[in-house]
Curated annotation (Swiss-Prot):
Keywords: Cell inner membrane, Cell membrane, Heme biosynthesis, Membrane, Transferase, Transmembrane, Transmembrane helix
Gene Ontology CC: one annotated term: plasma membrane
Bilayer-crossing regions: 32-52, 53-73, 104-124, 125-145, 153-173, 180-200, 226-246, 251-271, 285-305
A Gene Ontology biological process term: heme O biosynthetic process
Organism (species): Chelativorans sp. (strain BNC1)
Organism lineage: Bacteria, Pseudomonadati, Pseudomonadota, Alphaproteobacteria, Hyphomicrobiales
The protein, known as: Protoheme IX farnesyltransferase
Entries under InterPro entries matching the protein: Protohaem_IX_farnesylTrfase, UbiA_prenyltransferase, UbiA_prenylTrfase_CS, UbiA_sf
Similarity-based family: Belongs to the UbiA prenyltransferase family. Protoheme IX farnesyltransferase subfamily.
Domain of life per record: Bacteria
Catalytic activity: heme b + (2E,6E)-farnesyl diphosphate + H2O = Fe(II)-heme o + diphosphate
Role: Converts heme B (protoheme IX) to heme O by substitution of the vinyl group on carbon 2 of heme B porphyrin ring with a hydroxyethyl farnesyl side group.
This protein's record includes keyword Cell inner membrane: yes
GO molecular function: protoheme IX farnesyltransferase activity
Amino acid sequence: MALVEREHMKEDAGRLSEATAGDFIALLKPRVMSLVVFTAFVGMVLAPANPHPFLALISILAIAVGAGASGALNMWYDADIDAVMARTAGRPVPAGRIAPGEALGFGLFLSAFSVGTLGLMANWLAASLLAFTIFFYVVIYTMWLKRSTAQNIVIGGAAGALPPVVGWAAMTGSVSLESLVLFLIIFLWTPPHFWALALFKEGDYERAGVPMMPNVAGAASTRRQIFAYSVLVAVSGVLPTAMGFASLSYGAVAAALGVAFVWYSWRVLAAKGQDPALRPEKALFGYSVLYLFAIFAALLCDGLVERFGA
């Protein structure tokens, strides 16, 4: 199916809306922002540095604003396809509560503000990584990959995986192998998380013409790939212990969480879509959100114990 035409969105690009503060908050994708902030904070805590608390606070706020800027620019560009998807039709731009031009200006301002603040208050390596993250998510993923390939989530997942690296760099002025392991955990987690969603929202993506894996390769192939990635997720989760920058206690927690992730994925594979309500797919999607918060919470606790003692 062809992508929805953007012309009707362009016609309203210059008008002013009567948006509320709540609409602009929604434009920032606060749920996504919360995950970005949390993983970035974990990267900051695990980094071998002792920054001033004020620097840490400003850094995490700048990263949060940068994440919100990405969300605003994504909603600006994707308003045409959001309008025809039941899951996203109520977002501020397609619903007409915020004009496209306002969303664009808001996103650009927040992007510049967040990058500039992080550069001036922390260091320009972290600011450059934040700028790259915003660019990659908005231009590479949103404007290109999302509408052109079923590998959109795989490649585009790099943007969502970078926040802990940005947080680490903000504290140390460098990028380390440990921070890249944090990146890897999120990068490998992204495909099974979003493909589980795509399996029970397949009609939405098909109507919008977005080439998600189930629409392109079929549901059976998607289930096999979900399972394969889930095994990799489980392995990546224990790497911090294997590499010596997390404790055996963390490793045990990560292993248990990873086994559960594989089990949920196996249920999706074994069900073969025969459950009309797609309960295994919905269960995996829900657990995947819990998994990422839990694995980074375990890393955070481990890092705090290491830093301050038991």
